[in-house]
Amino acid sequence: MAACSVSQSKTIEWDKSTLVEVHKGGSYARMIRVSGGDILCCFEFWGAALVRRSKDNGKTWAEPIQVAKAPSGSASNPEMLQLANGWVLLFYNERPNDGVHHFTIQVSVSKDKGRTWKHHSLAYEADVNPHNGCWEPSAIQLPSGEIQLFFANEYPYKDSDEQEITLLRSFDNGKTWSEPKAVSFRAGRRDGMPVPCILKDKSIVCAIEDNGFSPMFHVMIVHTTDNWNQPPADGSSPRRWRAIEQPIDVEWGGGPYIRQMPSGETILSFQSSVGREKPQMVVYVGDENARNFVGRSVPFEVPRDKGGWWGSLFVKDDHTITAISSCNGGVWAIDGRIK
């Protein structure tokens, strides 16, 4: 039997005593722990990418620092990655609204653990037309030092509504980037919102949203054991599977996020619309291979006519997973444990 075999009884128990508002207002929040122990939380607020710091393990948060602002429109979808050399990269999606500036994936860097920031590189440039844009960057660093940056990309499909998941590689700590490579594409559909995770067996998975089964999105896992050297995983690829073992047919699986616990379990979150007027964040527990997700739990209490948007997950320690969501008027976080 696998060391981390998941049963129907596994779920997350959320500790309401840990519930904290990180920021009043704001959206698309993500957390990392930097060397030294502080936690950083990045999020979008009034079109800018901001970062707040916690020195007490997420109980309280210092005043926000502005990392990036777009010349037109917004600096959206911020996501952080601490590199092996100690730098912290913040990736964001420049979303213009003037018909002049391009949609881009930009990178900012902090060399002092998130205290000060400067622009680092332009990773990708798409069109000025929002129908041919690029969206939602997220990244990992391999043990070799290679950075892999994933994002949703309409730009290669100017004559259709299709979208792929694109990979860029950097071998110099994010200063320069490779040519784009498609790693996931279902013809005629829209793969979106990728979140990568390096598993304990050194393979890589990417949680994405996929509207290939119905007009609603479902969460899919795309997998590689050869560092994405194969053609993109299409709708029939064995390297691509539905995440939820027993999906609810009417469940909208937007905005996925995935992490792996030190004990091996994979934790998956996404936005669910089941029994609601607007979606909320739900969380499932999977096995060590990012399969067989079960044990649906709801970390935040949100009125059914209000939304819980753009959730994420943070492995706080060996036994604690933190859920973060934009709900109830702000960016909220809560700790949970597998039971």
Residue ranges with predicted function:
Residues C4-K339:
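Asp-box/BNR beta-propeller blade signature and adjacent active/binding-site loops
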